[in-house]
């Protein structure tokens, strides 16, 4: 009887915490930044493979068979998310934070403002491909050096990823077209 009540209360408390964590601004800056880190990690199948600690979840997430394929529209949506991220960071009052959290907040705000400034003012100013590095070589290096092939499933995932490289490069070519259009 007491076990059931304790379990119910624990489940309720955990549910409230998770809802708060993912629905809006968590109570703690540390929890918010940890959530953002995890969300960004899960958003990139390459990062999930690189880290490797979530490979046991691959049958569910299927991250080892996917590549990030960022379109121009995805970049716009990410930019809007970054602006929202900055607003949430700034909504944490320094008076409610510890000294360490204030420093962490300043670093996070600085980094986020740099991301926003870079997107708004220098989005198409880089050279993502050149003769010694870039997206084309990163794809090859990732597939040869990082993607694990320890089983038949991972070999099949490897082939699925290889088949997605063309679409990823096509989006990069669209980025170049937009860069040329802007001048």
Question: What label would you give each PLM region?
Answer:
Residues 6-183:
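Membrane-proximal, proline-rich intrinsically disordered regions
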